[in-house]
Amino acid sequence: MATIQIIIEEDNVTINVKKNQVPPIEVSPKIPPIEIENVKKNVLCPICLIAKVNTVLECTHVLCSNCVKKINVCPICRKTFQSINFFRL
């Protein structure tokens, strides 16, 4: 029976198996916290990819108000909607 030793360091995980050695596994770097300013600047409408999102549909998908005015079905999940919620970032 093989013995497994797991060594966890800050950003590396190494697994050693007695008799056989497994190469180190790279762990993804820690994801930095999301800053609200970055969200405001980078949230573009997934339909037109031009305008910032400012509308939430009943299905919780978000679009820009220009795209929402042209549709009555969510282009992402295909659910029909009756109400639209506008918001300001």
Swiss-Prot record:
<keyword id="KW-0863">Zinc-finger</keyword>
<keyword id="KW-0862">Zinc</keyword>
<dbReference type="InterPro" id="IPR013083">
    <property type="entry name" value="Znf_RING/FYVE/PHD"/>
</dbReference>
<feature type="zinc finger region" description="RING-type">
    <location>
        <begin position="45"/>
        <end position="78"/>
    </location>
</feature>
<dbReference type="GO" id="GO:0008270">
    <property type="term" value="F:zinc ion binding"/>
</dbReference>
<dbReference type="InterPro" id="IPR017907">
    <property type="entry name" value="Znf_RING_CS"/>
</dbReference>
<dbReference type="Pfam" id="PF13920">
    <property type="entry name" value="zf-C3HC4_3"/>
</dbReference>
<keyword id="KW-0479">Metal-binding</keyword>
<protein>
    <recommendedName>
        <fullName>Putative RING finger protein 121R</fullName>
    </recommendedName>
</protein>
<dbReference type="InterPro" id="IPR001841">
    <property type="entry name" value="Znf_RING"/>
</dbReference>
